Every structure is written in C-alpha cells, then in structure tokens.
Amino acid sequence: DQSHPNAEGHKLLCSFIENLLTEAENAPDEEYTLPPAYRFGYPFMDSQLVTPEAPTAELISLTDTGSFEAVEQGTTDFPTSWKLSEGTDPLKFKATASSVFLLFKRNNSDTMGSFEVYINGAKVKTIHSNQKDGWNEPYSELAIKFQTIKDMDIEIRPAEGSEDKNITILGVAVAAQESAQ
C-alpha cells in the first residue's frame, strides 16, 4: 500500500489489471470444478454481524455500550458505528460462537487508537487502528477462533494510552462452526 493511493501507484495498478485481463482473454476455455469441501471445513460459514442499527442476531447480541456511543458514520455501507466517547467502559456482547471478528475503521493517523478484545474476562487480542496502510476504510480482523462453540462474554476496551484516541467499531461478527483445526 506504499504505492497506492498515489499517481504512480494508480499507473502500476492499471498495468496489473490490464495484464490480468489480457491473460484471461488469451487463456484457453476450461471448465473449473469446485472441490466438494474446503480443505479446512467451513469455519466462518453463516457468520452473523451486529451493528448499532441491528444490535441483535441469533448468535450475538449487544448487552452494554459502555463508553462507546452510536454515531452517524456518513458512509453507505456503515451509516452508524460505535465510537469511543469519554471513558474506558467496555462495549459488551453475549455470543454463542466459535469465532469472533471485529470490523473497525483504520487509518494512517496518530489520532487512531488501539483496543483490546476480551473473551470471558481474558484478553485475546489487541487491535491497532493506526496502520501505515490504512486510509480511513473499514477493516476486519479475526479476534479468536475456537474449535468448538462456546458461550462468550465479549468486551472491547480502549488499550492503555488510547483513551482519548479515535476508536470506531463498525460491527462485530461471529460464526458457530465446529472444526477439527
């Protein structure tokens, strides 16, 4: 992402796309058969997403907004989000799932903060929304994936030093799939 978005990066991406289309156009027509199952199963099939506009789904529901408030985002895909306001109280959810994803806004800016994800009281991940390849876009990260389905209390807290930074959670997604790996 160091080459894009900028003028030289645009030219480079255009040449990549042009090459891809040329290769596809010149490739022999062959029918592709999908494999009967993914190698590692379907761990994220039927995922469910909650947002400020739809805070409850079958597998997950919002229980407390803490120091986060629902704000107008002004984008088509995510018109509202949970944004850290004043304080450090966690955004809380209850879920029955095997994996948890966080959808958040990231940017290449020192105004962006880090947040911690806790499952049943144990910290499982710290996510940094200040990323050098960020450009104020939605981004997702897998917080945790278990092999079995578990009841979870999920908490999202600002990391130490990020209490006054921009932390914008667009949604939380979960999936409930048993897996061997």
Please annotate each region the language model reported.
Residues 8-181:
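Conserved catalytic region of serine esterases and O-acyltransferases that act on ester linkages
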Residues 1-8:
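Second-shell loop/turn segments in exported
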